[in-house]
């Protein structure tokens, strides 16, 4: 069977488009034909067995306890559950439930101020904190094969973001839970891949929306409609990138050497 035929026959799970949400009830059998409870039941069963294994049970139990503790019932609305804790509070509580004492904070150098606010909060709660920024080591981007025109600011020294170094440093301190604060897309993935300790995200980087990426979705039907634009031409993105590259190269050639005067 060809790869194309396999792709045509494969039924994809797509919970995001489900209109029934039966998984939040006992009536899972009423789900759509591509419900994971129907077409991936064996996968779910195996995952559940791993979840309740001695290796994972404590983590899963405490995570669910943490979720349950984040709601209260107000006297004037006893039938409504209301959220009661910020994410910062939840992270600290979960770490306490797990018995963690040494936490790692991996942050983007662009949010060092925010990191400087976070660390004392964690320390005041009794945690020992190791924090490391993305530019640690000042390794030049040329190490990655960057040419001058590829930099954000050609003609200037630019250190690379170094999530592998961040993870390695925190690993060397045997941190028990690592908190990520605004690492770049891609760099966050590399950090997660290389961290030996479990990780959680306090904030995801979004340069346009003040590190609140869901705002792009909330405005996707109005001011941020460009994210819905379909790429009708397969190579449209490549052409755009090629044009940007040529423009950057031209600017880099015209720019006088650093320190020179016109």
Predicted region positions:
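An N-terminal assembly and electron-transfer interface module characteristic of large anaerobic redox
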Residues: 1-262
